[in-house]
Amino acid sequence: MASIRELHEQLVKKERSAVEITQETLDHIQELEPKLHSFLHITAQQALEQARAVDAKIAAGEEIGLLAGIPIGVKDNMCTKGIPTTCASRILENFVPPYESTVTQKLLDAGAVVVGKTNLDEFAMGSSTENSAYQVTANPWDLSRVPGGSSGGSAAAVAAEECVVALGSDTGGSIRQPASFCGVVGLKPTYGLVSRYGLVAYASSLDQIGPFGKSVEDTAILLKAIAGYDHQDSTSLKVEIPDYVASLKPDLKARSKLRIGIIKETFGEGLDSVVEQAVTKAIEQLQRLGAEVHVISCPNFRYGVPSYYIIAPSEASANLARYDGVKYGWRAPEGDNLLSMYKRTRATGFGAEVKRRIMIGTYALSAGYYDAYYLKAQKVRTLIKQDFENAFKNVDVLVSPTAPTTAFKAGEKTADPISMYLNDLMTIPVNLAGLPGLSVPCGFDEQGLPIGLQLIGKVLREDQLLQIAYAYEQSTSWHLSQPKIS
């Protein structure tokens, strides 16, 4: 599939119509979905209507933006008016939002064509997209393996060219880890840069919406469209949004002395040797492009996972208390009274992983353990943030592997929650600190599975991350590889 810019030029020159591009995309989805299961809902009728509106503008001689007529996937935890939003949970299987999330409204205003809602781990809780109540998404590079999670449907859809770009959400790595597993670009913005209004909450102090793309430029274009202040989100940042696309240049030498820090705690035990080799070569390539490389220590990095799995479940236990079968969503048919209906609805409506995290969170917040667990985890979070602040006194950007391994086999880790949680070892600290993080393809293992390089930036320096990722991407060919889906 062509890039956003290439498709835009084809539309403007009237070489192809938006309807033709949309129909080709829908046909491609129809062909691949029996194997991939990237989408929970395919919105063919609405997509074609949106495409016809773009064609009408072009026919009338009106100017269109870069995203007009571009097929986009949206993770199914973002509210879409009149279109089911299930969060891949049985408890929301019949929920159709009466309003549009801010990010999807921005896409519609830009003329983008939403071709469907993508699969995820239930309520975005997972690292493999195996926790969906409806289907398990396959990795386009190897159908027996997972695409990562929780935004696995979005990552797989972009990798398989079922859409040009897609939206995901990232609470502890849910954009970057699937991007690494599927060989695409994924960016988690600074906390507050993108509105969370209409995003179904998992952990409100950590959740952030971000873009997936086949290339850095496509990712930058989508970020530019969704970033910005929103009065409907109390955590939204009132800041000027730079032109992320204009800052993309293929050479780092134009920058004055770019300093990159290697987080030494992300190398060593638990990291696959093939991942370490690929990331090391990527760092060497950044040096050749003009970057100055330093080794940096973030001593509390290793405590990211244990602190996250107290903070995030605690917030989830509060956020998910609203699902009781009364106002919306699914309700258990049996029940002698209101209390038994509540219990049955939640017991049968939530999956095992969601119930596990609600229980962990409720326990951590209980009177006898609040100080010992929740408050202590918040103190560790502060230490992790301070580690990053100290590191950024000496360097501009930090690098690490995105994930410790390449994509694993479906079913391999489902019986071992701790092993599954460790997939986000490299990404979780970035969320705890509210920083921007980006994963860019940097190689393949001996089985042909993608590997990702993680770039971590200072607050609101997405422009710098995208610039570095773009320079690296343009000097390599990893992003040009395409999975062969048989």
From Swiss-Prot:
E.C. designation(s): 6.3.5.7
Tell whether Ligase is among the UniProt keywords: yes
This chain belongs to the protein called Glutamyl-tRNA(Gln) amidotransferase subunit A
- Give the molecular function GO annotations: ATP binding; glutaminyl-tRNA synthase (glutamine-hydrolyzing) activity
PANTHER family attached to this UniProt entry = GLUTAMYL-TRNA(GLN) AMIDOTRANSFERASE SUBUNIT A, TRANSAMIDASE
Pfam family name, one: Amidase
Q: Which residues form a coiled coil?
A: none
Q: Which UniProt keywords apply?
A: ATP-binding, Ligase, Nucleotide-binding, Protein biosynthesis
Task: Determine if ATP-binding is one of this entry's keywords.
Answer: yes
Q: Which family does it belong to?
A: Belongs to the amidase family. GatA subfamily.
The biological process GO terms on file are: translation
- The residues responsible for catalysis, as annotated, are 75, 150, 174
Q: What job does this protein perform?
A: Allows the formation of correctly charged Gln-tRNA(Gln) through the transamidation of misacylated Glu-tRNA(Gln) in organisms which lack glutaminyl-tRNA synthetase. The reaction takes place in the presence of glutamine and ATP through an activated gamma-phospho-Glu-tRNA(Gln).
Q: Name one GO cellular component term.
A: glutamyl-tRNA(Gln) amidotransferase complex
The entry describes its oligomerization and partners as: Heterotrimer of A, B and C subunits.
- Origin superkingdom: Bacteria
Q: Which reaction equation describes what this protein catalyses?
A: L-glutamyl-tRNA(Gln) + L-glutamine + ATP + H2O = L-glutaminyl-tRNA(Gln) + L-glutamate + ADP + phosphate + H(+)
Q: Which InterPro entries match?
A: Amidase, Amidase_CS, Amidase_dom, AS_sf, GatA
Membrane-traversing stretches: none
